[in-house]
Amino acid sequence: MNKEERAKRQSKIRNFSIIAHIDHGKSTLADRILEKTNALTQREMKAQLLDSMDLERERGITIKLNAVQLNYKAKDGEEYILHLIDTPGHVDFTYEVSRSLAACEGAILVVDAAQGIEAQTLANVYLALDNNLEILPVINKIDLPSADPERVRQEVEDVIGLDASEAVLASAKAGIGIEEILEQIVEKVPAPTGDSEEPLQCMIFDSLYDPYRGVIAYIRVVNGTVKVGDKVRMMATGKEFEVTEVGVFTPKTTQRDELTVGDVGFLAASIKNVGDTRVGDTITHAKRPAAEPLPGYRKLNPMVFCGLYPIDSARYNDLRDALEKLELNDSALEFEPETSQALGFGFRCGFLGLLHMEIIQERIEREFKIDLITTAPSVIYKVFLTNGEDMIVDNPSNMPDPQTIDRVEEPFVKAAIMVPNDYVGAVMEICQGKRGTFIDMQYLDETRVTLTYEIPLSEIVYDFFDQLKSNTKGYASFDYELIGYKPSKLVKMDILLNSEQVDALSFIVHRDSAYDRGKVIVEKLKELIPRQQFEVPIQATIGNKVVARSTIKAMRKNVLAKCYGGDISRKRKLLDKQKEGKKRMKSVGSVEVPQEAFMAVLKMDDN
């Protein structure tokens, strides 16, 4: 293509993504848009087409972002090229959303006509505003009996401050309003700016690993043009490769000769080493490089850490490969090797949140067929020592001796919880139980309230979300951001089995609740650890002080079975002999700890 053709084509490109709270109908709307633009034949169409991972389809949530190119003939008779970049809605995957938005000029904001605005809707809107996107509100599910589009339209104006007078009323399920949405995209979303003659700049917004083609980078071309056979350079790593194929997704990968300004597609360059491409990096030509990389994303810091260990220790290297491949596709994951006396070799992994952690575990077990043991999740603590030094602790077993500690600081988050009026009391109770500090309360309308609390992250990590959902019948929605570290009275609690410390069961707890937590956990472990041939004491200790203890009784054989009647001294002798044997066994015996016991440390608040 020559310069004029490229410029004409560029003016007809529209890049947009769809943002919404979980379950407001994002993926269904994406399906309808694909149908309307005839991207697929009827036979290929299936529900939630862009959610390609099995896990996504099972849980009905979008985890990964996806991109597709569509052709649309608008009412003005022109052919437009639309790039739809689908995004997740769950708080743990905000990172995926911010990456998709960086590749767009516009966003469709989907709001449920019955439920109105929820916490995640707001969080995603702010991300879109940060990226200066044109936002088109769409009120979805208007065919529901409980739908109240006018109230929601008012809410969009009041709460977000967007003009919703032209908001499309739609029902993705029934296919109402889809054409209006497409027309608004063509009219209101700006065409990409950029120059096809400038040095090449492509933003990598995702990548995946193909065993035959190497790493495939999903890119958005900002300036310049990239063709097959070009030598390209990754600006962050400085590595150079020759492009073997470029193309677009129509959801299927379709090869093209070149990608130019505004295109969203993929690039493969037989990159075999996973570490050579970084999501958020800029690709440029090796011969005529761009002066500087595109502003990348801010690197997200993991909030939650846990240990992952293969049940079969021979598969340690397989687990490393699995994590490396997942990291390529999920740049928010971090991991480093660690060892535990109880569990052997494994990795300490960092995640954005609990859902993220669960998904990664499930993907490793499914896609790579590795059985895992996971330890209790923890957060990063800052420990200041009496000698003036400070250290960072992300694993409870690395906590220094209590005598040497001056103070411990833990991360706090500001949590915004949206909840119907009737449940305000229940939510406040949960937050106070989690050592939360009340900050603010605002009414959105007559029926809904936003509560703002400062809560230690470690309290949210366990089961805050589950409690919130169950105590508000699923109506509360919740979003949080890190605000920094504050000192807390924290102590490390160790669990001893048969007088031996099990490092993987240690956890850090607030001093005020230490005694209760210790009591609960030893009782729980007593139920979960199978009975042995000898008596096993379970102790919870802080430093060298035991705060709770419980004993698993020994199983024993009835050694008196063969004495019919008989003399008491004869029975005594047999019983003493048995006792002696048990004692010997106890001094050498070790106790197997089942996986449920490690998880019990987490699920303490069920009772």
Curated annotation (Swiss-Prot):
One of its GO terms (molecular function) is translation elongation factor activity. Pfam families: EFG_C (PF00679), GTP_EFTU (PF00009), GTP_EFTU_D2 (PF03144), LepA_C (PF06421). CDD domains: EF4_II, EF4_III, LepA, lepA_C. Its EC number is 3.6.5.n1. It is found in: Cell membrane. It is an enzyme of class 3 (hydrolase). GO terms for cellular component: plasma membrane. It catalyses: GTP + H2O = GDP + phosphate + H(+). Residues 11-193 form the tr-type G domain. It is a peripheral membrane protein. Keywords: Cell membrane, GTP-binding, Hydrolase, Membrane, Nucleotide-binding, Protein biosynthesis. Its main location: membrane. SUPFAM superfamilies: EF-G C-terminal domain-like, P-loop containing nucleoside triphosphate hydrolases. Required for accurate and efficient protein synthesis under certain stress conditions. May act as a fidelity factor of the translation reaction, by catalyzing a one-codon backward translocation of tRNAs on improperly translocated ribosomes. Back-translocation proceeds from a post-translocation (POST) complex to a pre-translocation (PRE) complex, thus giving elongation factor G a second chance to translocate the tRNAs correctly. Binds to ribosomes in a GTP-dependent manner. HAMAP family: LepA. This is Elongation factor 4. It comes from Bacillus cereus (strain ATCC 10987 / NRS 248).
